[in-house]
């Protein structure tokens, strides 16, 4: 016998449920989603420019300095401080100490700076530390 044709029932239509579209993400950084009344603050770059200028005026009150020379001097000071900090950190690590003290700084000055310059730097540094501790 031939199989009976399956009775076809009308399919009930259910309302199609639409998925909500992905919403646009609002940027959370300061660039796009700033609050009203607040301005984006500029990150301040710390320099030694005012101190360089003060020392220049102490030594030579009648002489000025160009912005390019100031920038070069500032870079020089940053480089020297970076070398001294690195050397001091090495010394502290060698001696298995967790803290960089004035002794490590003094030793690193003697190692990094040449001859007479190191002697003057050590004496000025000692004088500054003495003045700081007594005040």
From Swiss-Prot:
The keyword Nucleotide-binding does not apply. Its main location: nucleus. CDD domains: HFD_H2B (cd22910). Residues 1-43 are annotated as: Disordered. It comes from the Eukaryota. Can be acetylated to form H2BK6ac and H2BK33ac. Core component of nucleosome. Nucleosomes wrap and compact DNA into chromatin, limiting DNA accessibility to the cellular machineries which require DNA as a template. Histones thereby play a central role in transcription regulation, DNA repair, DNA replication and chromosomal stability. DNA accessibility is regulated via a complex set of post-translational modifications of histones, also called histone code, and nucleosome remodeling. Phosphorylation of H2B was not detected. This is Histone H2B.4. It comes from Triticum aestivum (Wheat).
């Amino acid at each position: 016998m031939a199989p009976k044709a399956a009775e076809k029932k009308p399919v009930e239509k259910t309302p199609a449920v639409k998925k909500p579209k992905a919403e646009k993400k609002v940027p959370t950084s300061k660039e796009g989603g700033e609050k009203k009344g607040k301005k984006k603050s500029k990150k301040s770059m710390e320099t030694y420019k005012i101190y360089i200028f003060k020392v220049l005026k102490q030594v030579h009150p009648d002489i000025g300095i160009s912005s390019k020379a100031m920038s070069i001097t500032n870079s020089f000071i940053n480089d020297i401080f970076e070398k001294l900090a690195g050397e001091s950190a090495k010394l502290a690590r060698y001696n298995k100490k967790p803290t960089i003290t004035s002794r490590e700084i003094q030793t690193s000055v003697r190692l990094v700076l040449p001859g007479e310059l190191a002697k003057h730097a050590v004496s000025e540094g000692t004088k500054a530390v003495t003045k700081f501790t007594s005040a």
